Amino acid sequence: MFLTSILLSSLYLFNRILAWQGNVKHFYLFASNLLLLFIVVLYINFNTFSNSFQFNFELFNSLNPFGLSNSDISNGLLFGIDGLSLTFILLTVLLIPLTLLGNWYNINFNSNLYYTLVLAIGLVILLNFWALDYISFYILFEATLPLLFILIHIYGSSDSERASFYVLMFTLSGSLFMLLSIVVISIVLNTTNFINHNLFVLSLDLQTIIWLGLFIAIMVKTPLFPIHVWLPVVHSESPLAGSMILAGLILKLALYAILRLLLPLLCEAQILYTPMIYIISLLTIILTSLATLRQIDLKVIIAYSSISHMGIAILGVCSNTSLGIYGSIVLGVAHGFVSPALFLIVGGILYDRYHIRIVNYYKGLTTYMPQLATYIIILSFANIGTPLTGNFTGEFLSLQGGFIRNPIIGGISCISVLLAAIYQLKLTNKLTGGISSIYMHRTNDVTIREKFIMNILIISTLIIGICPQIMYNLLYWTVNNYIYII
């Protein structure tokens, strides 16, 4: 009843705000900062020594309508957090206000709807990381699709219609296999609760059926080779907020789904199919890195580099080692800081000034925009995985975990470090080095708002790289729970 009252009050307040003739983006920014403060309070009160889910609540429970978390009666949608979910929740609440700030002055058409969609997507992803049962996870997993579809379709570039349908067609088709697996789990176990699934042991044949359905959905969402072609198209046509959310948060749902859905319940099937995953991850890392070298669209270059980094994260999370699993989470979070910052540069700052994303038109940014050139160099080194950055910690541990599990695949995967340096330094040299291009002109350098966003993201990835113990304290119990011995 209490939660219902909050929901009704929020809907009424939201309706009144939309009826207001002023701009609602200030309210949404204020609300997102309040949400950040609330999650920080939860983080402070989170017990890192506990091996159980905390801050639990339940919705739509007809047998327990008051949503008491300590009740044994449960037929509703469960929500709660542990160290893993809290890590990604912190990433989410940090990126939401920064994403709102990214297009603060550039949306002239129906800006209220734009900021509403951005905040709504962020809230859905936040609840997705909070979900403790398969049904609520799937509902929220899919709820981002129509919102992202509308955002890209209305506010995207010239070919936004094709990009929006790519999002819907690819991800929805893959998620149907997840739905079938969840139905099988519900029928066999008579529960969809994450908390209880460690109590069950399934046959290998049944695990295989469920695992394949879940992995297909995760493979599309990551995305992995050969179902990765939709992401560069979507990034190239998305508005800035769409690219920042897609790279920073939505791709992390796939990594989170492996840790939350596959490893605890389907460990034997995971062992069986790990060689296949390693081959797919290796192909994803190498082929997308090589494809990056041939691209001329700035956003497509960053999109392909994101796919390559996620391939490394998948390699680590499937290594069945604490180093690999921890490294994959660190890499996922660090990528959630660096990639949105790069999209802000290429899809926000440069495109706003020069209205072109083709890399050949840019040269010698140090002449006209020296501060932006400095940010490009710093973020390029962070994206490569330079020491003291979170990307270095995540990639090093993920590759080490992969090497421990399979020395051949792990060793070959290390070529990703060289390829990342080649394509990222090539891009950086193109943008910042040499004499300024004839297509460029003197314009405003980085504004205070843009500096603030990039400084927050850079400082965040440096904190993870210099003090990885911060995340390790949160993830200790979670990571060790996912190590299995067969």
From Swiss-Prot:
Topology versus the membrane: Multi-pass membrane protein
Principal location listed in the UniProt entry: mitochondrion
One Pfam family recorded for the sequence: Proton_antipo_M
Signal peptide: none
Bilayer-spanning residue ranges: 26-46, 76-96, 113-132, 134-156, 165-185, 209-231, 239-259, 271-291, 298-318, 329-349, 372-392, 407-427, 452-472
Compartments, record wording: Mitochondrion membrane
Record-listed E.C. numbers: 7.1.1.2
Protein name as catalogued: NADH-ubiquinone oxidoreductase chain 4
Source species of the chain: Yarrowia lipolytica (strain CLIB 122 / E 150)
Primary gene name: ND4
